[in-house]
Amino acid sequence: MNVLIHHDQPLEKWREGVMTRMRMSALLGGRQLCIFDQFCDPGLGAPLHIHAVEEVLEVIEGTAEIWLGKKSAIVKPNQSVLVPACAKDGFRNLENTTLHVRATLAAPIFEASYNDTAETSRRWTPNHFDL
């Protein structure tokens, strides 16, 4: 059994105004899940994108506007949104404080397709799987 100490995981600059902390991925031994926390400055978050797998977006602190397809919802702490595989989604911070969102993907690596081709599409991918 491996006990993970999440606050020991480094914060990574995802994009300007958005920091990310990995909780579980292939790099940490996960085989079917990628779980990470994002900390977003006011007005910032994740641009519209698509994952090939299901995702759950949970607001831990703050208030987010989450987009799913052509719909949007205001999501507060202890609320989440299930994003179906291949659905376009994104979110932004609606408050003047830091938004904390936890994302869970049904895959051990992060892969996404963005409208903005400058955005990184793959993260937390080990060089070799030790299967």
Task: Identify the role of each PLM range.
Residues 54-55, 59-64:
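Glycine- and acidic-residue-biased ligand/ion/polar-headgroup-sensing regions
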Residues 82, 96-114:
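A short hydrophobic beta-strand segment most commonly corresponding to one strand
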Residues 48, 66-67, 83, 89-95, ...:
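Short beta-strand His + acidic residue motifs that chelate non-heme Fe in jelly-roll/DSBH
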Residues 36-50:
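Conserved short histidine dyad/triad with adjacent acidic residue
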Residues 41-43, 78, 86, 96:
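Tight coil/turn sites that cap or link beta-strands
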